[in-house]
């Protein structure tokens, strides 16, 4: 359990320095969370930080289940 909290702390610290990096480490490059965080960071640094910290704290990647839908 302590290593999980330590990893979360490091991800939040990275998210404060460079918001998309913390989200990338948790969810990957092609996730919706990463794309939203990247867009918010480009539009404004502070909204990117707020969203990144929210995503890292509120969404648990182990319990987070994605639903994939076919496009065609």
Swiss-Prot record:
It is a multi-pass membrane protein. GO terms for cellular component: membrane. The gene is OSR8. Belongs to the UPF0057 (PMP3) family. This is Hydrophobic protein OSR8. Its main location: membrane. It comes from Oryza sativa subsp. japonica. The chain crosses the membrane at residues 9-29, 39-59. It is found in: Membrane. Keywords: Membrane, Transmembrane, Transmembrane helix.
């Amino acid at each position: 359990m302590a290593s999980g909290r330590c990893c979360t702390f490091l991800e939040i610290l990275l998210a404060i320095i460079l918001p998309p990096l913390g989200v990338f480490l948790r969810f990957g490059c092609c996730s919706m969370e990463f794309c939203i965080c990247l867009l918010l960071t480009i539009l404004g640094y502070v909204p990117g930080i707020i969203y990144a910290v929210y995503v890292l704290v509120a969404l648990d990647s182990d319990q987070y289940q994605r639903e994939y839908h076919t496009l065609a």
